[in-house]
Amino acid sequence: MKFLFDLFPIILFFAAFKVWGIFTATAVAIVATLAQVAWVAFRHRKVDTMLWVSLGVIVVFGGATLVLHDEKFIQWKPTVLYWLFAIGLLAARYAFGNNLIEKMMGKQLTLPHPVWDKLNVAWALFFAVLGLANLYVVHNFTESQWVNFKLFGTTGAMVVFIILQSLWLTKYLKDE
């Protein structure tokens, strides 16, 4: 259910784009992300850093898209967000000694520390590649194809990555 909740702004963006175009879709995505943050704050009293970063990036890049009437800003947003996640994962680990993947998943999984480090790097590389893929699609495909890629391509890539990661992790999980 959380996965669908996380996709809420993207799904609304996609639907609004299909009906009204990129600029209305951008405004819808900003409002949906604001609503998402407000709901999480109301419901849990704490909003994850990743959600705050997502809100900041959508407001800045979505706002630039609307103010300057230039769709390139909203198209760059996923790349900026993915690269910030990649940098954040690596900086937290290697500059501050915190493995954010372990902090997020450590209560659900018991893994050796070197495996957590590999997982952290794998996620950082995955986000870096997603950012590059987004730029490639932005510059080589139509706006409509980019919107489809944003919903289906990145979501599909995420699902495949999680499945492959889960298969890889099975050799490290202890029978309980």
Curated annotation (Swiss-Prot):
InterPro entries: YciB. The chain crosses the membrane at residues 3-23, 24-44, 49-69, 81-101, 121-141, 149-169. It is found in: Cell inner membrane. Keywords: Cell inner membrane, Cell membrane, Membrane, Transmembrane, Transmembrane helix. One of its GO terms (cellular component) is plasma membrane. It holds the Pfam family IspA. It is a multi-pass membrane protein. Plays a role in cell envelope biogenesis, maintenance of cell envelope integrity and membrane homeostasis. Belongs to the YciB family. This is Inner membrane-spanning protein YciB.
